[in-house]
Structures are given as structure tokens and as C-alpha cells.
Amino acid sequence: SLLTGAWMPYNLLSGAPNGDGKWRIAQMPTADGSETNSENGGSSLVIVKSDDKAKVAAAYKFMEYACHDAEGIKTRVDGGAFPADNDTLKSNDFLNMTSLTDSDGKAHEYFGGQKFNEELAKAAANVSTGYKFLPFEVYARGKFGDYAGDAYTGKTTLSDAVASWQKDLQDYAKQQGYQVK
């Protein structure tokens, strides 16, 4: 199992090719059984400050193409990006995909023929607006593997690992001057 963002399918294809056909996409389980989840990731395109007006104009033109032009959006999505626009996210072409294309142009039913984008789009529609990242999110994510890894290798239970991770985060928060409730 892997709890991750919608950007992961193409990373799996390129990074774990032997998993081809063995993975499936599902909604993340929650304690109360709801389908609510949180955002994990995203991407940004920026223009760095420059006195070269031609370069700035070209960069802006590219950003417009990549983010607002249907062809540019399709190019990014075909390359593995998750769509940031609702038209693509709701399109039948996107929702009905069952295969990923590798860098050699070969199609792979990495998720066993599943319409994987249907699940990813459903998850995107159910992102909670009340979720907030920790002010020390990078620390928290970095420490998670330290504790979850012990559960994965059988040195402890997942429940105990999560409890230890929580205590670590509470201690760290207090050390950094945050009030822990």
C-alpha cells in the first residue's frame, strides 16, 4: 500500500516497472468511513526576476500555454501531471484512461485495466477545505518514515508507531514554541 498524491502513477511506472499490472487505486481509508481526504502536493510554475523583458515575456507565454491552453494542459497531463483544470479533470478522455505511456511510447495497464483517474478525480473532489498543514510539515513527514518503517519491518505495531510519531511531533512542537492542544 502507498498513501500518496495523484501525481504518483507515472512515477510508479518509471520507478517500479516490475509492478506493472499489480497496483490499484482506491480512496484513502478514514477513521469514520467518510471519503474526505487532504491535499498532498501540487506544482508551481514561476518566472524569476529578470531585466530581460523578452525572456520574461517568453516565460509568461509558456505559462499561459501550460496552464490555460487546452493543448498545453493536455501536453502536461500526457506527460504525467495531474490536471489542475476542471474541464480536463471531468473529461471522458481523462476519466476513462486505463493505461500509462512510458518514455518509449509503450502503453502499460499498470493498474490492471482499472479506470484509475476516476478514483483520483473522486479523491480530488473530496479534499477537505478544513485541513491545514503543520507549520513544521517537512519535519513531520521526515520523521514518519522513522516510525512507520519499524512497523513495516515488524519491530512494532503500526498503532504503537503512530503513537510514538505523535509524541515526537508534540515534543518537537513544544520545543519550537507551539502550543499543543
Label each residue range with its predicted role.
Residues 6, 16, 69-70, 169, ...:
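A generic secondary-structure signal for well-formed alpha-helical elements
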Residues 1-61:
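Extracytoplasmic/periplasmic substrate-binding proteins
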Residues 15, 35-37, 106, 110, ...:
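Homeobox/homeodomain signature
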Residues 106, 118-181:
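Conserved C-terminal helix/tail region of periplasmic/extracytoplasmic solute-binding proteins
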Residues 10-14, 43-138, 179-180:
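Mature extracytoplasmic/periplasmic domains
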Residues 3, 19-21, 106-107, 112-115, ...:
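Acidic, low-complexity intrinsically disordered regions
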